[in-house]
A protein has these predicted regions:
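Short, hydrophobic/aromatic-rich segments at coil-to-beta transitions
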Residues: 25-34, 94-105, 122-125
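Contiguous, well-ordered beta-strand patches that form the walls/edges
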Residues: 70-117
């Protein structure tokens, strides 16, 4: 039930911030997590939001997922995906005492990645959307449980 709430919250926040650049960095962070994949939800031409447990997939866990933020506007993420690690222009950057939320688009606005991590529970939801604004858009939603390797949580 909690996961469903965060999934709905993530989609709500993403939909509300799609057309605007939103930056709210309220915390200075330097965090590193080890994250274990719990499940993946896939929506494409073959699957309509089908859920796969981690044991059913051949996907590596995240050995080093890093978040760095510095007030008022710096947020960098590394280790979640190549796209996010190489993208310094995140469209949405929100950091507060409870969550870290971020989203980035490619230049053509046909591909996006977003994620939200709840700092207290360590739950991470990572969403990849391909073919945005087409009839055959695809979503890949990964849900991880993360453990903090750093002390400044």
């Amino acid at each position: 039930m909690v996961r469903l709430f965060y999934f709905i919250l993530l989609n709500f926040l993403i939909l509300n911030f799609t057309n605007a650049k939103d930056i709210s960095i309220g915390e200075n962070l330097n965090l590193e997590f080890i994250c274990e994949l719990e499940k993946k939800i896939i929506k494409n031409s073959e699957y309509n939001y089908k859920t796969f447990l981690a044991e059913e997939l051949n996907i590596k866990n995240l050995d080093s997922f890093q978040i760095y933020s510095n007030k008022p506007s710096t947020l960098m993420v590394n280790g979640l995906s190549k796209f996010l690690s190489q993208n310094s222009n995140l469209d949405v950057k929100i950091v507060n005492k409870d969550v870290v939320l971020f989203k980035a688009f490619n230049n053509e606005k046909t591909y996006s990645e977003s994620a939200i991590i709840t700092r207290k529970s360590g739950e991470l939801i990572h969403e990849i959307t391909k073919n945005i604004n087409t009839d055959n858009s695809e979503k890949d939603i990964s849900i991880y449980i993360c453990k903090n390797k750093s002390k400044n949580a």
